[in-house]
Amino acid sequence: KTDVAEGATTLEADPQGRWVFVVNPEARAVDIIDTAAARLSRRVALDEKPSHVLFSSIFAYVYHADSSNLSLVKLSALADAEAAPVLIIPMGVERPEGRLVRPGLLPMDLLPDEGGAVVANPVEKVIYFYTDGMMSPTGSFKTWASNPLGVILYDRSLRERGNSGVYETVTRLDEPGVYDVP
C-alpha cells in the first residue's frame, strides 16, 4: 500500500513495470512509485497541470492540457537518489488550455519503434512529431480542416528478427482456422 497526494486522476506503468506514474493535476505534480521497493519514490513538481503520461523506451512524456510544453522524465535517472531531471520541450506556440481535451482520447501516442512520440495540439490544428533526446519537434503535420483531439498510430510494418532474414509482425485474426499467407 502506497499513499499518494489527494487529487490523483490516473496512473500509468512504464513498459518494464518498475515505475508507476500517478498524475495529479491539482498538485501540479506526478508522484512516482517504485514497484521494486513498493514505496513512493519521489514527487516531480511541474509548472503546469499534467493530464496524461506516455512511455517510450527512454522517457516518460508528460502531457499538460493547459500548456504548450511537454515534460520529459528520463526513466534511467529514476533509480538515482537525486531528483530526476525534467526536460521541458515546446509543443507549439498556442496553449491548448484544456478547451478541446476530451475524456478517453489520448492526445499523444508512441512511434512504432518506441523512439519518440506524436502529440496533438488541437488549438494550432497540428500534430507534432518528437524523437527521443531532441529538445524540439522533429516535424509536424498540419490538419487544416479539423482540430486533432486524439492520436492513435497503427503499426503495420514488418521487422527483421536480428540479421536472420526472417521477418515478423503482429496481427489479429477474427476467427480460428487455416489461413494461406502469400
Task: Annotate each language-model stretch with its function.
Residues 1-182:
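Predominantly soluble domains enriched in secretory-pathway, periplasmic, or organellar proteins
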